[in-house]
Amino acid sequence: MVARGRTDEISTDVSEANSEHSLMITETSSPFRSIFSHSGKVANAGALEESDKQILEWAGKLELESMELRENSDKLIKVLNENSKTLCKSLNKFNQLLEQDAATNGNVKTLIKDLASQIENQLDKVSTAMLSKGDEKKTKSDSSYRQVLVEEISRYNSKITRHVTNKQHETEKSMRCTQEMLFNVGSQLEDVHKVLLSLSKDMHSLQTRQTALEMAFREKADHAYDRPDVSLNGTTLLHDMDEAHDKQRKKSVPPPRMMVTRSMKRRRSSSPTLSTSQNHNSEDNDDASHRLKRAARTIIPWEELRPDTLESEL
């Protein structure tokens, strides 16, 4: 916002300076401008002013574009930070799931071992019971004991398989979710990398353009300072400007008697009894007014101009 305010101030200053320069040019008479525009000097000055305006406008646009690019880069950096945070969270969650998986798998292994030991113990018990009671229960068939063993083994096996399958499904779901999240984060990082590359290219091009514009503006400014004021050619204002530097010398030297007007001569002839102090005051006032009129007017050498040039310009 500060840079935009500066560019607005620069543009307003340039517009005011151009308006003042245009007013200075329009104060001269129309024949003067039409005649001397034939040489091409005034047109060159206008072209230089237009080029300066364009350079300032381009510089303001470049500053605005650089500000927008900086804002977009800040936003992208924020998005990258958020994505990195989500990625860290997902990785931590994935590690937790792996740890839980390892813990649950360890529990399953212990359960399997316990079940195997229990089955072995039961088999030992059954075998001992069969051996001890073989004589008493010869009439009974061995099919009943086998059925009991098969039922117990199938029941424990179903529990183990169900528990293992459930845990396996949960781990597969968690792995799929983490893979999708990692893929999305990778694609986002790739897009952000591409955007940052394009931003760096744009910033480099903007810097090169800005340096070129600054160099051109400096060259134009040096050229504008070196060239003389075209609007004062053919007038007596240049002599008045030279006389302004010798103001102290003119103040010390008394005005000549040829500068006295006819009204002063008549006043002296009509009133010879006036004091010398009043005469000196009136002479100083007339001299000051004469100098002001001389500085304010613009003399055009009409005698040096040919009538055919005036008719061609009209």
Curated annotation (Swiss-Prot):
Residues 1-22, 241-314 are annotated as: Disordered. Keywords: Chromosome, DNA recombination, Meiosis, Nucleus, Phosphoprotein. Coiled coil: none annotated. GO terms for biological process: meiotic DNA double-strand break formation; reciprocal meiotic recombination. Pfam families: Mer2 (PF09074). One of its GO terms (cellular component) is nucleus. Residues 281-290, 303-314 have a biased composition (Basic and acidic residues). The keyword Nucleus applies. Residues 12-22 have a biased composition (Polar residues). The keyword Phosphoprotein applies. GO terms for molecular function: identical protein binding. Its main location: nucleus. It is found in: Nucleus; Chromosome. It comes from the Eukaryota. InterPro entries: Rec107. Phosphorylated during meiotic prophase. Dephosphorylation seems to be dependent on DSB formation. Essential for meiotic chromosome segregation. MER1 and MER2 proteins must interact directly or indirectly. MER1 might be responsible for regulating the MER2 gene and/or gene product. MER2 is not required for mitosis and mitotic DNA repair mechanisms. Component of the MER2-MEI4-REC114 complex which seems to be required for meiotic double-strand break (DSB) formation. Interacts with MEI4, REC114 and XRS2. Component of the MER2-MEI4-REC114 complex. This is Recombination protein 107. It comes from Saccharomyces cerevisiae (strain ATCC 204508 / S288c) (Baker's yeast). The gene is REC107.
